[in-house]
Amino acid sequence: MAFLRAIGAEARYLTQRAYSSAAPTTKLFIDGKFVESKTKEWIDVHDPATNKVVTRVPKATQDEMQTALESNKKAFRSWSNQSILTRQAVMFKLQALIKENMGELAKNITKEQGKTLADAEGDVLRGLQVVEHCCSIPSLQMGETVANVARDMDTYSLVMPLGVTAGIAPFNFPAMIPLWMFPVAITTGNTMLLKPSERVPGATMLLMELLNEAGCPPGVVNVIHGQHDAVNFICDAPAIKAVSFVGSDQAGKYIYERAGKNGKRVQSNMGAKNHGVILSDANKENTLNQLAGAAFGAAGQRCMALSTAVFVGDAQGWIPDLVERAQKLKVNAGHVPGTDVGPVISAASRQRINDLIESGVKEGAKLILDGRKISVPGFEDGYFVGPTILSDVTPSMKCYTEEIFGPVLVILKADNLDDAIDIVNANPYGNGTAVFTTNGAAARKFVNEIDAGQVGVNVPIPVPLPMFSFTGTRGSFRGDHHFYGKQGIKFYTQTKTVTQLWRETDVNHTQAAVAMPTMK
């Protein structure tokens, strides 16, 4: 198939569910070419549904990372001078190619990450929307002008690229998060060194093939693989001016501090504990269905998953009905038709999830739905956890204070809306939250008083479309400018202000002016 021609026939493993005793290797992408790494250190990537190795990812050597960076630096000199219409044209082509190949991208995501095919297509689609927004770059990157700020003097601002930027992406959205990063970076005239998660490299590599086909010049985006050494290289390299990161708290704080100390601009999206507040006047059927989907979809591995529910007053009587809906969700391999909940990413992740469930039980929570011992016929070696619900949870319990990142919903109870708002605001995270109600006054009170960056009213996962920005706050984000939207443009650009004077009289100065200019 033409889609994979540049990577080579051996790359068909990226989208086909076939395994071999000698797993193929994932390439680096440097200067427009897919390059075999010379490293001696490799990381196995497992299909979460089968535990079989699908590819081996290199830990790029220092020389390889430096080569990629030099390619980015060289490409910036020419790419930043291309017309904005040329950069826009690449986005138009990339957008069309992603649409055309969405199914192939989704197959790879399901194979490496585990989520259902429908959810994987959503992963690609939400990233595609950022590409579509970047097609408006001539309007998004406009500066400002004030004519005649003084006699014969004009001042205007230019929105300029930074230089070489870097992106460090997580495992849970193999296509969406890289597409939050490199399209905005390169359309504004930067180049990017991208490090996808070593657990799910395939989607990024397929996107690089599409980027080549879209006509993006060599070196504008390069891809390296690795773990700590690759992260440190990105944080320390003087040529890299800005770093985008999405992932865990520990990594996000480390990258923000290390890169920041080296003078880099950083945006760091980290952990979350998103609450859904359910009032008794809500539409019961819609609310419970939305809760189940938002809590257990993608096996709970979304930074905007509703992992916590606060039932207010009489709505607490709906909890058994929620359990009934969760029990009906089908747990299976992501590529199997009808699957609602796929596996989690790894055996270690499954163990951590199970340990947090057990900690809740030991601390006094009620385990009203237990998915720990689920077995999926034909996929007994997969990393499965079924939908799990812990009720009567208190804010001091470990299952509440830590991000579980699995198909686990913890339930708290509140007597009234004020108490529910206090619970949400006392949590250190501020990624997102939602309220379910038919009362406009209650919804308005919630929106005004809640301390979270993204708020849904009868919308369980309020991730904004890219004409807005992804605006997590408090413990969920570090940095000054958020991802995509207007803030994303600001993150990847800097302002150059020009003041020019052309005297109408064109009279030559007869002597130097040493007094402070007053702009009159």
Swiss-Prot record:
Q: Which GO terms describe its molecular function?
A: malonate-semialdehyde dehydrogenase (acetylating) activity; methylmalonate-semialdehyde dehydrogenase (acylating, NAD) activity
The enzyme's first-digit EC class, named in words, is oxidoreductase
| Amino acids binding NAD(+) | A169, F171, K195, E198, R199, S248, E403
Q: Which PROSITE patterns match?
A: ALDEHYDE_DEHYDR_CYS (PS00070)
InterPro entries, alphabetized: Ald_DH/histidinol_DH, Ald_DH_C, Ald_DH_CS_CYS, Ald_DH_N, Aldehyde_DH_dom, MeMal-semiAld_DH
**Family affiliation:** Belongs to the aldehyde dehydrogenase family.
> By what name is this protein known?
Probable methylmalonate-semialdehyde/malonate-semialdehyde dehydrogenase [acylating], mitochondrial
